[in-house]
């Protein structure tokens, strides 16, 4: 039944030879890998206006030069990540660049930041989209958390079905959002050019503003730069592209940059010209749409596609998180299970862990994840700064043809990214301080996991000079709970191993019961030695393990190995297990950590 449900949800298993069919073309890749970046157009311009709102509407003209600054940073990031794509065509993005050029710890800081950031991407995006949806249907607002969890589960299942299938479904809402905003910007500019919009709604550029300061402008710039989250996703996901993967990834990155630049600058310009003031109740995009079209079909079309893109921005996390996890797992910094492809050739363990972690965040914050946005943004600019600094060192060290121009691009990007990151810490420390706690903890865990894998590798290697003690005999211990077919089956198996000695062990709680059992045993299995252990505290495990320790100590003197044969019956139906004591599993769990003790479980399958 479980298998049938799994097949229904994620589809039939795919052969490894079908991996090429699971690669993305540029159209689908643009949709699923740029959804996070494009969705930030819905809140990036608004963040600039919110930062300027303290000085009044007269200061809103500063949104134009600030937007130009954001576009300069966007250009530097796009050109930089394009260089990263060709320099590191196997993916890995900021983690690989930082690790190879700055050192292991900077690489782990970049990788750890991005892992957490992709979890935040899913939680924040789905929560924001759910808020947009329940704003249109207020009766659903009380169920925000449940609705958000359902969306996360839906996107998780969609990604478990395979990258091409999820792209085929999710591409439509993304391109509908792009179309909706192009129409909005086009009609808005047309209305301005034809005089339909009054020029008195906004203050002229250059109007003096009392109280303006460089610090406030940098704060607004940092807030607006939140629109650049998700730009790095394509460089992490190069392995998902069809061949030639680096060329296709680079073209997709340029297309995303161009779209983001047009949409972001268009919304900022319309918000300025329309004199839009940010409001808790109505978003900036909603106000622009209402002033442009009124409350008609186009208004609701824009609102609907905006809500969808906010939810589907989570898919960028699902595309990039598993691939980043693969790179970290290959370097032994996180569990190796992240390198295993699932039935549909995706890295399903990474997808599932991302979904679970996102749901935990949504539940913990009760769907009110807007407080995580600054943390989400600073988590992106840390790897931005590190990756571009790494590329600066790479060009200085290698000095290939045209290195000076490449160096300039990366240096500009590194400096601006560092300024933005610093502004987040200076202006929103109360919301981002936690990254200074959990990031070192994550790095510590990375190193502990790496240390464990290295230690295991050293111990398992045949090159290790470890003395092998020869096995000259075998003593078999069979824990028994009664005289049944299960025990009989295990004893027959034990006898077939040609052991030097087979010992049956019975743990009794009652003296009378103990005597009766011994008498019956002599008649049933006279050739098998029985040892009865009396348990004063009704424990099976303690007296049994103590006895096995004694046997093992005696056996080791003669280079004998102790084998414990555990009888276990297997019910016909899985749920029947909850009706029985799982003594065999407990015994096995305890004995696994005993040195020089071999454990064998002998199953006896019930027929009804």
Give the location of each predicted region.
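Cytosolic C-terminal regulatory domains/tails of membrane transporters and channels
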Residues: 1-16, 455-457, 461-464, 469-608
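Loop-to-transmembrane helix boundary motifs in multi-pass membrane proteins
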Residues: 25, 104, 145-149, 242-262, ...
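Extracellular loop-to-transmembrane helix junctions
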Residues: 49-99, 103-111, 124-151, 257-261, ...
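Membrane-interface loop-to-helix entry segments
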Residues: 155-190, 254-255, 373-385, 405-416, ...
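Helix-loop-helix junctions that connect adjacent transmembrane segments
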Residues: 175, 180-229, 427, 431
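Hydrophobic alpha-helical segments and their helix-loop junctions in multi-pass secondary transporters
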Residues: 176-203, 268-275, 385-400, 448-457
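Extracellular/periplasmic helix-exit of transmembrane alpha-helices
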Residues: 186-196, 251-287
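C-terminal membrane-solvent junction of multi-pass transporters and transport-like membrane proteins
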Residues: 337-348, 384-429, 459, 463-465
């Amino acid at each position: 039944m479980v298998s049938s449900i799994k097949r229904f949800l994620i589809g039939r298993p795919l052969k490894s030879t079908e991996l090429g069919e699971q690669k993305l073309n540029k159209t689908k890749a643009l949709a699923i890998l740029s959804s996070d970046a494009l969705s930030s157009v819905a809140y990036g311009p608004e963040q600039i206006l919110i930062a300027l709102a303290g000085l009044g509407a007269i200061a809103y003209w500063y949104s134009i030069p600030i937007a130009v600054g954001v576009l300069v940073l966007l250009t530097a990031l796009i050109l930089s990540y394009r260089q990263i794509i060709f320099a590191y065509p196997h993916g890995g993005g900021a983690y690989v660049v930082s690790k190879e050029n700055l050192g292991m710890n900077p690489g782990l800081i970049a990788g750890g930041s991005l892992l957490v950031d992709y979890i935040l991407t899913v939680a924040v995006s789905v929560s924001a989209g759910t808020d947009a949806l329940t704003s249109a249907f207020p009766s659903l607002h009380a169920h925000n958390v449940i609705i958000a969890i359902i969306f996360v589960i839906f996107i998780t299942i969609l990604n478990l079905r395979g990258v091409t299938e999820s792209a085929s479904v999710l591409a439509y809402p993304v391109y509908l959002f792009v179309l909706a905003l192009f129409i909005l910007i086009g009609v808005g500019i047309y209305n301005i050019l034809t005089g339909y919009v009054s020029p008195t709604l906004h203050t002229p550029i250059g109007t003096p503003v009392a109280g303006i300061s460089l610090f406030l402008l940098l704060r607004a710039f940092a807030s607006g730069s939140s629109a650049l989250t998700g730009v790095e996703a394509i460089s992490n996901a190069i392995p998902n592209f069809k061949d030639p993967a680096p060329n296709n990834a680079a073209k997709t990155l340029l297309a995303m940059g161009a779209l983001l630049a047009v949409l972001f600058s268009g919304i900022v310009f319309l918000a300025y010209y329309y004199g839009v003031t940010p409001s808790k109740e109505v978003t900036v995009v909603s106000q622009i749409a209402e002033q442009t079209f009124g409350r008609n079909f186009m208004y609701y079309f824009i609102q609907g596609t905006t809500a969808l893109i906010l939810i589907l921005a989570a898919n960028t996390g699902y595309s990039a998180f598993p691939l980043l996890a693969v790179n970290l797992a290959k370097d032994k910094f996180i569990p190796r299970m992240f390198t295993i492809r699932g039935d549909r050739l995706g890295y399903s363990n990474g997808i599932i862990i991302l979904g679970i972690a996102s749901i935990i965040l949504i539940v913990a914050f009760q769907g009110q994840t807007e407080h995580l946005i600054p943390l989400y943004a600073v988590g992106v600019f840390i790897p931005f700064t590190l990756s571009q600094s790494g590329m600066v060192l790479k060009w200085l060290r290698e000095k290939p043809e045209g290195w000076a121009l490449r160096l300039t691009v990366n240096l500009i990007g590194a400096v601006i990214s560092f300024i933005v990151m610093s502004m987040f810490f200076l202006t929103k420390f109360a919301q981002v301080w936690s990254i200074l706690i959990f990031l070192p903890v994550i790095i510590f865990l990375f190193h502990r996991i790496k240390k464990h894998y290295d230690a295991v590798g050293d111990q398992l290697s045949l090159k290790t000079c470890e003395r092998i003690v020869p096995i000259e005999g075998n003593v078999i211990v069979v824990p028994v709970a009664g005289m049944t077919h299960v025990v009989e089956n295990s004893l027959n198996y034990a006898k077939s191993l040609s052991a030097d000695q087979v010992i049956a062990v019975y743990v009794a709680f009652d003296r009378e019961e103990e005597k009766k059992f011994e008498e019956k045993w002599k008649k049933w299995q006279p050739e098998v030695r029985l040892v009865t252990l009396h348990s004063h505290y009704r424990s099976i495990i303690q007296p049994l393990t103590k006895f096995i320790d004694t046997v093992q100590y005696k056996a080791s003197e003669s280079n004998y190995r102790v084998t414990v044969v555990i009888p276990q019956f297997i019910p016909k139906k899985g749920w029947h297990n909850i009706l029985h004591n799982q003594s065999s599993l407990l015994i096995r769990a305890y004995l696994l950590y005993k040195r020089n003790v071999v454990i064998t479980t002998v199953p006896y399958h019930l027929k009804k």
